[in-house]
Amino acid sequence: STEPIPVHISEETRRKHEESCRLYPWLNLSEHEYVIQMIPRHSIGIWGPTFAMILAIILVSVFMFCYPDIAKPIGLAQSMYPQVILICLMVIILFGIGLYIAIWVYMQNRFFLTNESVIQEIQISLFSKREQTVSLMNIEDSSYSQKGILQTLFNYGSIRLSTEGDETTYRFSYVADPKNQVAVLNNAVEAFKNGRPVTNDD
């Protein structure tokens, strides 16, 4: 049988690969693959749930501290105040944990551009996650869209990738500065298909 010919890996490529493995140890990178850019979601996507949860915590806190004043006019027992404090504190803690989980899940949705592929991590819930990997060679088209005043004002939008062959479409929403991200991606795809090194400077 014929042994596969080992591919020569330059010192620079090896260094970049090792650095990427150190920064993103959960990614399954080949021995000559490294991360060029990590694209997180724009924080605006979590502003609404965060505001709602903070408002709920404030309302529960106000009720807890004002219970004696509220209870007297409507005939509720003042002796219940210790139990009310305990229940309100438990509700506040639950709201806080829920907010933390929501932010964590949202921010775990990430988009990686390497010198060989695009990797999209999709965190659906606390215990549900999937990953999509597309070779740069298979990317036929990449584009971005910004719709509405908010997306234009805060400079975020969506990235869309379409692939050759199976014609699958990949989308990543709430991307900060999508125009620049797509420019970097298009340069990387062009360099890869033309056999040129894919670097951060492309």
Model-derived features: where do they sit?
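N-terminal basic, Ser/Thr-rich segments that initiate or prime the first beta/alpha elements at protein or domain
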Residues: 1-202
